[in-house]
């Protein structure tokens, strides 16, 4: 009898060990698959120049403030916008900033773009983030957008995996909560990063582009790729990248310096401000550069650092 019990225990431990090993193996395969999802369509890496490394890996961020003239609800609003560019390591699996060094980390140029303006009695606060590989060899790994005003909040996020995975939350009934996938196309949100990384490789001609999440959410349009015409022109020390969407009656122009580090000087967005498209009311939002500051802002959070906002005109 003891012999059989001993045999049963031995068999049980063998089965459990086999399950554990297979489980770990499957988890490893799953993790490997997740790590390679975003990079499965990656092109050869672009080599980083010495000036790029010196400028973007100096241990600080580039912060540029802009005077904003924002069209909203059929009227022009005065406000400010800030573009914060900084390089950081990115976790391929979790698609967040890496806290530790790891061989699978992807170096990205992150853009945090903010806008603040008033619509009558209540304020608008908008922020978009895009994480673009510095080697310019694939789409942005992640894009997110949020807007806050007194009516409520809106949030949307795109993750670059086998497909573009989107989640969206809104207080508007027409948008509500959504979760879906899309085929990969050029993202308008990633082109701002691409200008800073490799402007000579900007897509031009008749192409399919997914408009910015800011535009899509604030205009209540469908998030999808739209036919667009993109051009890149040069005038003196500046270049202008223009995207026109015929179906949306919308044109975006981004003006940036012709020489490295390709700082964005201004932009304009002309669009039909009528949400229901019942009447064409074309208006143009504009942003013009005020000041640029390079600093590790995450270390400048004391009251004695408030003067830095003055240096940015904020």
Predicted regions: what they are:
Residues 25-27:
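Bacterial signal peptide processing site
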Residues 2-12:
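Bacterial N-terminal signal peptides that target proteins for export
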Residues 21-23:
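C-terminal motif of bacterial Sec signal peptides marking the signal peptidase cleavage site
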Residues 30-162, 202-314:
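Acidic, serine/threonine-rich low-complexity disordered tracts
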Residues 5-6, 49, 185, 291:
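Intrinsically disordered, low-complexity regions enriched in Ser/Pro/Gly/Gln/His and often acidic
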Residues 158-204:
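Surface-exposed beta-loop interaction hotspot
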